[in-house]
Amino acid sequence: MAKFDVYDLSKKKVGELDLADAVFAGEVNEHLFYEVVKAKLASDRSGTHAVKNRSLVSGGGKKPWKQKHTGRARQGSTRASQWVGGGKAMGPKPRDYSYDVPKKVRKAALRSALALRSKDQKLVIVQEWKPGAPKTAAAAKVLAALGAKKALVVDDAANLALAKSVRNLDGSDFLAVEGLNVYDILRHDALVLTADTAKKLEASLS
C-alpha cells in the first residue's frame, strides 16, 4: 500500500490515506497512453466529410460531342472527374472512425496515468470539497493554494456546485469519477481528487 497525504482546501495536512500500489504507484506505460488517447481522439471525429461523385453532381446527362470523327478524345459526360465542375473520383465519404479498446487496456492505461501524476507529485488528495454555492473565484483560490492551477478536479457527479465553480476556470475542468479518462488526466497539469473519489478509483481499478 502507498501512503498519500490528505489536505484541507488550504493545503494543510489533515491525515493520510493508504491506497493500492497497483492503482496509484504502479509502472508508467506510455504506449498504453498512445493506444487509449488515439482511440479517444478517433471517436471524437465527426466523420461527416463528403464530396459529390459523378452520379451526384447535377447536369452532364448529354454526351458533349459525338464519339467519332471530331479529333478529340471521347467523352461521355461533362461531369466526369477530369472535367472542371465534374464529380470527385474516390473522394472521402461519411464514416465512423471510432473503434474499441479492450476494457483491460483502458483500465491499465488509467492506472498508469494515475501513477504518472503520483510520481510527478501532481496528484493532490483533499479531504472533501463541497462548496455551498458555485463560486469560480473561490475555486481559483483553492486550486492556487493546492498548487494546482491548471487541474482536473474529480468528484461525484452530484457535486454540481463544485462542477460549476471549476468549469469557468481557464485550463481547469471538473469530471465525475465515473467519467475519468486518460486523455483528460494527461492534458491537465495536475489531478485533484477527494478522499472518497480516490477510494472509489482504487476499488474500480484494483
Swiss-Prot record:
InterPro entries: Ribosomal_uL4, Ribosomal_uL4-like, Ribosomal_uL4_dom_sf. Pfam families: Ribosomal_L4. The keyword Chloroplast does not apply. Residues 63-72 have a biased composition (Basic residues). One of its GO terms (cellular component) is ribosome. Keywords: Ribonucleoprotein, Ribosomal protein, RNA-binding, rRNA-binding. Residues 48-97 are annotated as: Disordered. GO terms for biological process: translation. Gene3D superfamilies: 3.40.1370.10. One of its GO terms (molecular function) is structural constituent of ribosome. Belongs to the universal ribosomal protein uL4 family. One of the primary rRNA binding proteins, this protein initially binds near the 5'-end of the 23S rRNA. It is important during the early stages of 50S assembly. It makes multiple contacts with different domains of the 23S rRNA in the assembled 50S subunit and ribosome. Part of the 50S ribosomal subunit. This is Large ribosomal subunit protein uL4. The gene is rplD.
